[in-house]
Swiss-Prot record:
GO terms for cellular component: cell surface; plasma membrane. This is C-type lectin domain family 7 member A. Lectin that functions as a pattern recognizing receptor (PRR) specific for beta-1,3-linked and beta-1,6-linked glucans, which constitute cell wall constituents from pathogenic bacteria and fungi. The keyword Chloroplast does not apply. The gene is CLEC7A. Residues 81-101 have a biased composition (Polar residues).
């Protein structure tokens, strides 16, 4: 049997035939398998890399979306809070008694012609039986009236020519400013009344008119230097508060 196998491998001249074809096929199959493994590893690396990139992009997208929603919600809440201010905010904007009493005219007239008394609150000056506060808070006539009320007083009421002279000395050092007093009227044709409802004495002083053709509703009064003028009640100006001297 061995002899027959050897004979089959001999050619016509008696040389042995080598089976190179089977070996070549085996080598090619091995090379092909190695190539497939290398290619598979290469694509697997690419797939893993792409998967990681997609995951990162997904995380970034989620974070940005969440941030955008939070900012939008915050913006809406801010608009709501600005559009509908709370009552506390309005209350905080109101002047306190301390700020009202501190807002006095810092002039020489106050220290030379006015007298500070322990019977009056700080920054108030004394004249006869009354205390006076010359406020530098700019407000309308109604607003100034409320400020004085908060301090337990009222807008200035002039009862005599002597009191008018005293007040004129205090405000004459402020020629650029006018001061609301407690004199007003409901209509142009109606009489001038003080806050307590009493009428203005005709022989005490005359009210100078500032009425123009465009606007005739000057129904509040202020003092400028030594004269009294009518004026629009909505105009913002300084004011004078008065209250009786404490015994």
């Amino acid at each position: 049997m061995e002899y027959q196998s050897s004979v089959e491998n001999l050619d016509e001249d008696g040389y042995t035939q080598l089976d190179f074809s089977s070996r070549n096929i085996t080598r090619r199959s091995v090379v092909s398998e190695k190539g497939l493994c290398a290619a598979s590893s290469h694509w697997r690396l690419i797939a893993v890399t792409l998967g990681i990139l997609c995951s990162v992009m997904l995380v970034i997208t989620v974070v940005l979306s969440t941030s955008g929603i939070w900012r939008s919600s915050s913006g809406n809440n801010l608009l709501k809070s600005d559009s509908f201010p709370s009552r506390n905010k309005d209350n905080q904007s109101q002047p306190t008694q301390s700020s009202l009493e501190d807002s006095v005219i810092p002039t020489k007239a106050l220290t030379t012609t006015g007298v500070f008394s322990s019977s009056c609150p700080p920054n108030w000056i004394t004249h006869e039986d009354s205390c006076y506060l010359f406020s530098t808070l700019l407000d309308s006539w109604d607003g100034s009236k409320r400020q004085c009320f908060q301090l337990g007083s009222h807008l200035l009421k002039i009862d005599s020519s002597k009191e008018l002279e005293f007040i004129s000395r205090q405000v004459s050092s402020q020629p650029d400013h006018s001061f609301w007093i407690g004199l007003s009227r409901r209509q142009t044709e109606e009489p001038w009344l003080w806050e307590d409802g009493s009428t203005l004495l005709s022989n005490l002083f005359q009210i100078r008119s500032t009425v123009t053709e465009k606007d005739s509703s000057h129904n509040c009064a202020w003092i400028h230097v030594s004269d009294i003028y009518d004026q629009l009640c909505s105009v913002h100006s300084y004011s004078i508060c008065e209250k009786k001297l404490s015994v």
